[in-house]
């Protein structure tokens, strides 16, 4: 909701006193709107954008993440380094080694590594690229993946800056490690 409002429509979302988003937003315009046409037009636009997002969400979350891994073979990662599928295979290998050191399930780490980039081929992330990684975690949760795996997928890009939160769970740490140790690729 917030990304759609702020990044795409340049609206200001509003929040209640508990910090929850409300069903209202603010728009700045240089014209008076005595008849409410500007308000109505903006409401229609945001409703259409959110309807698209909802459609993509329901479609994408129903598609098996493991079965979509092969689609990464068609996405180039970086010249000379192969596809995202190739990257995921390297991440699985490194994650497996880290799992031994962290004394955590190798299977869970390898599973999270295997599917962590699959949201890149989802329609929702295609429409809202800034949700990559985040949506992968939500898709995994919606499909019944264990919480550790979903969280590792969601937190794979953390930290995103010096003020950003950092992962604290072992599976997320392994996820961050295999993402950031190979970031120089």
Model-derived features with residue positions:
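Short coil/turn segments at secondary-structure boundaries
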Residues: 56-66, 83-88, 128, 151-154, ...
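Short alpha-helical scaffolding segments that buttress acidic/His motifs in well-ordered protein cores
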Residues: 26, 46, 72, 95, ...
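Conserved small/polar residues in nucleotide/adenosyl-binding loops
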Residues: 179-184
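Histidine/acidic-rich helix-loop-helix segments that form or flank divalent-metal centers
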Residues: 10, 113, 141, 146-177
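His/Asp/Glu-rich acidic catalytic environments and adjacent acidic regulatory segments
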Residues: 1-60
């Amino acid at each position: 909701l917030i990304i759609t409002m702020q990044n795409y429509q340049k609206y200001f979302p509003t929040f209640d006193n508990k910090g929850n988003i409300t069903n209202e937003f603010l728009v700045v315009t240089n014209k008076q709107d005595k008849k409410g046409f500007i308000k109505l037009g903006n409401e229609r636009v945001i409703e259409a954008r959110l309807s698209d997002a909802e459609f993509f969400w329901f479609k994408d979350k129903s598609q098996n993440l493991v079965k979509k891994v092969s689609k990464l073979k068609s996405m180039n990662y970086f010249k000379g380094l192969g596809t995202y599928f190739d990257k995921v295979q390297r991440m699985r290998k490194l994650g497996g080694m880290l799992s031994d050191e962290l004394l955590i399930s190798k299977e869970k780490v390898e599973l999270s590594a295997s599917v962590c980039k699959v949201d890149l081929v989802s329609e929702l992330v295609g429409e809202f690229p800034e949700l990559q990684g985040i949506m992968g975690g939500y898709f995994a949760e919606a499909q019944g993946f264990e919480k550790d795996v979903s969280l590792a997928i969601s937190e794979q890009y953390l930290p995103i800056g010096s003020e950003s939160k950092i992962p604290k769970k072992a599976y997320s740490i392994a996820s961050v490690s295999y993402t950031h140790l190979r970031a120089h690729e």
